[in-house]
Structures are given as C-alpha cells and as structure tokens.
UniProtKB/Swiss-Prot annotation:
Source organism of the structure: Schizosaccharomyces pombe (strain 972 / ATCC 24843)
Family designation: Belongs to the sphingosine N-acyltransferase family.
Residue ranges of the TM segments: 59-79, 104-124, 155-175, 195-215, 233-253, 270-290, 329-349
MF GO annotations: sphingosine N-acyltransferase activity
Glycosylation sites: N359
A GO CC term attached to the entry: endoplasmic reticulum
Residue numbers carrying Phosphoserine: S41, S366
Membrane topology annotation: Multi-pass membrane protein
Keyword Transmembrane helix attributed: yes
Protein name, per record: Sphingosine N-acyltransferase lac1
Gene from which the chain derives: lac1
Pfam families linked to this entry: TRAM_LAG1_CLN8 (PF03798)
Sequence segments annotated as region (Disordered): 19-42, 362-384
Function: Component of the ceramide synthase complex required for C26-CoA-dependent ceramide synthesis. Facilitates ER-to-Golgi transport of GPI-anchored proteins. Has a role in meiosis.
Amino acid sequence: MGNNTSRRSQSQKFKNIPSISAGSFSTMPVQHRGRRRRSKSIVGRAAQNAVLRSKEKTWIVPLILLTLLVGWYFVNPNGYIKYGIFLSYPIPGTNPAQYGKGRLDIAFCLFYALFFTFCREFIMQEIIARIGRHFNIRAPAKLRRFEEQAYTCLYFTVMGSWGLYVMKQTPMWFFNTDAFWEEYPHFYHVGSFKAFYLIEAAYWIQQALVLILQLEKPRKDFKELVVHHIITLLLIGLSYYFHFTWIGLAVFITMDTSDIWLALSKCLNYVNTVIVYPIFVIFVFVWIYMRHYLNFKIMWAVWGTMRTINSFDLDWAAEQYKCWISRDVTLILLTALQLVNIYWLILILRIGYRAFTTNDTHDERSEDEDEEVSDEKSSAKKND
C-alpha cells in the first residue's frame, strides 16, 4: 500500500505536462439513460437507444458516413467522391508518379479528416481504453485523457516515421535547409510526399473542429492551444500555396517527433510508473532540439538563404512566390509558433524542476481532471 502511494505521488508530478492535441468526441457528456423520457413505442425506443449508443460509441456516426461515401464511390467511380479518396492531379508519364496541386485537394483533406474522426474514436474506445483499464486507470476522466495521449503517441509515431522516410528521398536530408530553394518552386511531388502533406492537413483540420465545437472541457492552456492550431493551419495552407512544402515537411517532422515523447510521457504518468522520469528527460531534450534548435535553423533559412539562393522576386504568372512578402508572412507565422513553443517549454521545465527537486505535486491542469471526476461522481449520485 505504501509503495503504491509513493509511486502514485512520484508520477503525478508530471500531470501538468502541456497537451498539444485536442480532445475527442468521446469527451462529450453523455446524458444518463435514466434521465431520458422513455418512449412507449417500439420504434421510439429503438431510435432512442440508437441515439444513446451513438453518443457512447462516438465512432459509429463517422463510420456510417465513411461507409456511405465509399459505397457511393463504388456506385459511381467517376464521381466527385474519388477526389476525396485518392490523390488528384497525377502528371502523365512520370515515374515515380508525380502529382500537382489544386482545389480538389481540399476534398482529400476533408474526407480524411472524417476518416481520422472515426479512427481516433474507435482506437481510443475499443483498444486503448482496455489497455488503460489493464493498468488500473479507473477514473473516467483520467481514462479518457490516457486514451487521447496514447492515440496521439501512436499517430505521431506513424507520421513522424513517414515524414522522415519522405525527407530521406529528397536532397534536404537531414534538414539541409539550402535544398529548400535550390529546386524551388516545388510544383510537383511524388505520391508519398503529397499524401503525407495532405493527411497531416486532414489531421489538423479534424483537431481544429474538435476545438471549435468545444467537444471537450477547455483546459487551462486552451487559448494557447487554439493559437497553436490556427498558426499550424495557416502554415499548412500558405506553404502549400507558396510551394514551400519542403519547409512544411521539415516543420512537420520537428513537431511530430517531439510530440511522440510528449504523449508517451503523459501516458506513463497516467500508468504511474517511475519509467516516466527517464522518458521525461528524453522528451525535454528532443523537444529543445526539434522544436527550438531545428526550427531556429529553418527560420534562419527563411530569413537568410531564401534571398541568396536562386531568384528572389514575385512572378504571379510563373507561380514564383519566393519574395519578401512570402518571406515575411512565413517568418511571422514561424516566430509566432516558436513563441507558443517557448511558453510551453517554460511550463515543461518548471514541471521537471518541481518533479526532480521537490514534493510539490500541485498543478493547475490536474484540477481540471479532478473537477471532471467530482462532476461525474455528483452526476452518478443524482441519477441513483
């Protein structure tokens, strides 16, 4: 009993680690069955049960929508649905296949935003939740947080690895920033590059919708999270338009790889294991190297070598956007993103200092979870 208490108090020191990802649809409050007025008809009860089921299993509605869209594609393979499922603008005669850019890419992003909504909810509720219960995470609020962070860790592990693979196929490996401009403008990309970029965009669109609809209880750093998501979406959209996708790939990798260790640290914290200490140290070093050192290197390339390597002028007809306007816009957004990351780094270092030097386990973000647990208990008592 004493060992469990000690281990719990040790790991709870890391509860305040900031979270970069938004919540999930499963964090929406589900109205208790007993509080609903029961319909007397069989059809009414069936409809009522279906609604309740869809709120408890929040992956059902996205799955139905995906099934309908894919089914419609098989009915009409040449319809607009194909632009959501497959990459658009293939360049004939290219090997490996190259793809251009255009407005139809928005359909691809929206379809996979819906796909991620299903995947996220299904994996969290049907797989990760069982893992959490195996590690004795019983409080519903903490279990939901564990599900979110475990899914985030899984997603960024896949995407971070994919991003590094894509970068390895280009001259900018490993963060050779001069390559940003040597072959600019980048009108076309191989399928793996374009798919990676648009799927990342789809993920952040889905995350933004969760925040906009406020499908989870806002945390203490909600405003910073909103600013982070706005900057991220602006960088994705403008980099795609300006043909700065090589810069975007580099930034994606720095963010994704650091988020792996961030989410892993939070997962281990919920599991209550001392392994969280070395993982947290690794996380801090990866965060500083990826989100600060490498991003400052990217920012320097935008400020400096962008002007000195190849032409530096605006030509709308040739879609040559490497000029002072795009430079300043990109630099402002990267600087804003860096300021948010510095703010989070300060929080992270403060948490680490308290965890390793004191017994102070107080943090503001944990109060959110405690309030959720308290609310759930109060609600349960009222329904009894």
